[in-house]
Amino acid sequence: MKEVIITINGDDIADRIFSESAYAALARAKGGLPERFTDIVQATEDDRNLIERFIIESVNEAAGIISRYMSPCSATYMQTEENTGGTIYIRFAMPHNCPGSLAASLKESITSFAAAQSLQHWMLTVKTDEANIHLSKAQNDIARIRELLSSRTRPVMGTAEDENIIEL
C-alpha cells in the first residue's frame, strides 16, 4: 500500500464559486431582471464563511466515498494566515496496482465536485430553481470519482522467461 496525500487549496474552490455565481447574476441581468434579483445570486466576500462550510462538507463527502474503495480516508482542513480559504488535506492508502496518475485525477475530480456541490448548496439558499443545474454536475463528478477509485492496472506478461514473474 502506498500512502497518498492530496492537497487542495480552499481559495481555488471559493474563487470558482464566486465566479460562477457572478456569471449567474450577469445572465439574470441580461435577461432583464431588476438588480435586486441579480444581486442575491452573486456570492460576495461576506458570504465566504458560509461557502467555506459548504466546501468542507463536500470534501468530507468525497472522503467518505474514497473510504469505501480505499483504506480509511481522512480529510483535514487547515486555515493559515496567507491562505484565507484554508488548505484541505485528504489522506488515504492506495493499493500498488492503482494507476500512478490516480492522485492527480482524483484531485481534479474532488475539486470540481466540491465546487459544484458547494455552488448547488449556495443556490439552494438563494435561488432554489437554479440549484438542479449544479446538482447534476456534482453527480457527474461523484461518478467520475467512483470510476477513478475502481480502476486498477492489469499485470503485463513479459517476453523473457525471467520477466514472467508477476509482483502484486
Protein language model annotation of sequence segments:
Residues 94-105, 120-128:
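Short acidic, glycine/Ser/Thr-rich loop/turn "cap" segments at secondary-structure junctions
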Residues 127-137:
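Short conserved catalytic/interaction loops centered on acidic-Pro-aromatic/His motifs
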Residues 1-103, 137, 144-168:
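Conserved short "hinge" loops at termini or chain/domain junctions
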Residues 60, 109-125:
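Short, hydrophobic/amphipathic alpha-helical patches that form generic packing surfaces
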Residues 122, 126, 142, 146-149:
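Short, well-ordered alpha-helical segments in soluble proteins
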